[in-house]
């Protein structure tokens, strides 16, 4: 509708901003007469907005909540705490600016689920609140339900919750069921868990067929629950608005490799395994002789063993950035070695590629457990950390042994389900249309 004005409130940490911007781009393209005011910190916007946006997305920089002259400690939770303390007032002020600039009142609040206080703001403004959960179905269910049932939990598994029978308490994010329940992150999740059932709609990057039992559970929990993924397929390269970026020639390199032979390694942009583990990964790659692409930030390349880059120049490539989705979808891709972040898991599922997971923090262990024990499309690295022998054994298991063949078979089946979900009249295709209708309401 011509008069709709959607306020998008981003959570400016990790990959959250990137995820909600991707959805906002697609919505804005599908609804050119709707204005989307995108509110995010200047630092996060600077890292995200490298390409042209649809003209109906208006970008607004907001404060990060850090007082002028304040020096942050090395504790990453401090920045989150300062932002959350200041964010309600910061967002309120900028929303007034956005309404003045657009000349329209906000008609819908589209926010990261971590911006839990947006429910109160939407109620004050008498508009709908549409919340985006950026992780998986199991972490959403845990964050909104299990944290209130700690006393009734088994010491080992979450079998008391339908669809969670193979999940262990130790797989859950710290600060939800175990660990420091007074941390900033734990308190934020608790507040969010109480607030989300009030949302008009909760949506996420997944597809119903991946976890049908959990989909049913979440539909009962929320007023409206929509799975609109995998976003890597729904927002496919055929709809790409900017040229493919491959500055290091990864795609030209992989075209020369055999089917299902290449190891792709990437641990995300936020955290990386410690230097000692990077060393043994490098040693394992060199010893195994498998072809590889390793996406590793330049600041971490200093930790690689002396002579590794020269010694493996014909075997593989280490680059500061790689076109992950395109690499995973190449027929030469054999296995994805990852931290187990949700976006990476969904991109691997979308491509039908098995995984080796090395969880680092947050929902990584939960996602890795789903990969290994629920969907059986990969494995978690032995003992949870990289060792040279353990890494080589994992590569051999996935790429060569019968276990790996089963993982590949299961991964291909999930890929087919994912493709069906985003096809015309598929579940995610229809759910995205439902999301679009919701945000366009006046």
Swiss-Prot record:
| EC code(s) of this entry | 2.4.1.-
**Residue runs in coiled coils:** none
The entry marks the following residues as binding UDP-alpha-D-glucose, namely: 322-324, 339-347, 361-364
Pfam families (UniProt xref): UDPGT
Does the UniProt entry include the keyword Aminoacyl-tRNA synthetase? no
Which keywords annotate this record?
Glycosyltransferase, Transferase
Q: Extract the CDD domains matched here.
A: GT1_Gtf-like
Name the InterPro entries for this protein. Answer: UDP_glucos_trans, UDP_glycos_trans_CS
Q: Which GO terms describe its molecular function?
A: UDP-glucosyltransferase activity
Give the highest taxon in the source lineage: Eukaryota
Give the similarity note.
Belongs to the UDP-glycosyltransferase family.
Q: Supply the name of the protein.
A: UDP-glycosyltransferase 78D4
| Source organism of this protein record | Arabidopsis thaliana (Mouse-ear cress)
């Amino acid at each position: 509708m011509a008069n709709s004005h959607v306020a998008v409130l981003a959570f400016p940490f990790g990959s959250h901003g990137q995820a909600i911007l991707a959805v906002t781009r697609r919505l804005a393209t599908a609804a050119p007469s709707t204005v989307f005011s995108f509110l995010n910190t200047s630092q996060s916007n600077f890292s995200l907005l490298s390409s042209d946006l649809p003209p109906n997305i208006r970008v607004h920089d907001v404060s990060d909540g850090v007082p002028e002259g304040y020096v942050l400690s090395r504790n990453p939770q401090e920045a989150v705490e300062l932002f959350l303390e200041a964010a309600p007032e910061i967002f309120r002020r900028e929303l007034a600016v956005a309404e003045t600039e657009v000349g329209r009142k906000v008609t819908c609040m589209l926010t990261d689920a971590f911006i839990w206080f947006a429910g109160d703001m939407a109620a004050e403004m008498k508009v709908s609140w549409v919340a985006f959960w950026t992780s998986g179905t199991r972490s959403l269910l845990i964050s909104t339900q299990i944290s209130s049932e700690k006393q009734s939990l088994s010491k080992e598994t979450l079998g008391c919750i339908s669809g969670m029978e193979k999940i262990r308490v130790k797989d859950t994010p710290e600060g939800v069921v175990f660990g420091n329940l007074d941390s900033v992150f734990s308190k934020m999740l608790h507040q969010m868990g109480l607030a989300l059932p009030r949302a008009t709609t909760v949506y996420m990057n997944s597809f119903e067929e991946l976890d049908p039992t959990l989909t049913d559970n979440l539909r009962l929990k929320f007023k409206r629950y929509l799975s609109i993924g995998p976003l890597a397929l729904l927002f496919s390269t055929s709809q790409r608005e900017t040229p493919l970026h491959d500055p290091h020639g990864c795609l030209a390199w992989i075209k020369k490799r055999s089917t299902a032979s290449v190891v792709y390694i990437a641990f995300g942009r936020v955290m990386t395994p410690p230097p000692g583990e990077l060393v043994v990964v490098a040693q394992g790659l060199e010893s195994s002789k498998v072809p590889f692409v390793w996406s590793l930030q330049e600041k971490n390349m200093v930790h690689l063993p002396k002579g590794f880059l020269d010694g493996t120049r014909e075997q593989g490539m280490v680059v500061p950035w790689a076109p992950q989705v395109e690499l995973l979808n190449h027929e030469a891709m054999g296995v994805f070695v990852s931290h187990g972040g949700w976006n990476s898991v969904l991109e691997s599922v979308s491509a039908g590629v098995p995984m080796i997971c090395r969880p680092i923090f947050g929902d990584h262990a939960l996602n890795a457990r789903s990969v290994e024990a629920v969907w059986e499309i990969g494995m978690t690295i032995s003992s949870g950390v990289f060792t040279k022998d353990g890494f080589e054994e994992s590569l051999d298991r996935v790429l060569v042994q019968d276990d790996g063949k089963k993982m590949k078979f299961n991964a291909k089946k999930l890929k087919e389900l994912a493709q069906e979900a985003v096809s015309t009249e598929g579940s995610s295709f229809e759910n995205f249309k439902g999301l679009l209708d919701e945000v366009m309401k006046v």
